[in-house]
Amino acid sequence: MFYNNISVMIYKFFQVLLKISVRIYFKNKVIAGKNNIPKGKPVMFVANHPGAFMDPIVISSFCDRSLHYIARGESFKNRFAKWFFKKLHMIPVYRKEQTPELIHKNEAIFDACFKHFENGKSLIIFPEGTSKIEYRLRKVKSGAARIALGSEAENNFSLGLSIVPVGLTYSNPKNFRTDIQVNF
């Protein structure tokens, strides 16, 4: 019980801290389509990935719900990072190009994502798989589709999972006091 309360407190603390940081970091913020986010049901947010670590922070800052994040498995290498990232609701996924010896863990990770959706939780995934500052959508990987379809299949296609596309456009994500546009 105490452990769960600490986990919630850590997540909430960083959620508030990062919301404030995003509002300071970006000068002009245009947020559109928040009304497209359904309430009271599981949602998979599927976003482009132009700003690396900034992207999940930005989406979380303008979304009024607790979110879980699919993240690069290589980031979970040491014990502290693994502990800390889990407190921030990050879920590792392994890529055959970087960690072929760990790719087998993805089945259990996908099952965990299915359970999140069954419990009404929401998830952010970046199907491009990598981040690069470009003003175009790059080739997408199959993970988002596999997780969405797998979640529904596990629930006889009655889960009601909503997929909300998210478009992120930065004037320059690396520079302070630049502009951001988020379209839900």
Language model region names:
Residues 1-5:
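Short, positively charged and aromatic/hydrophobic N-terminal segments
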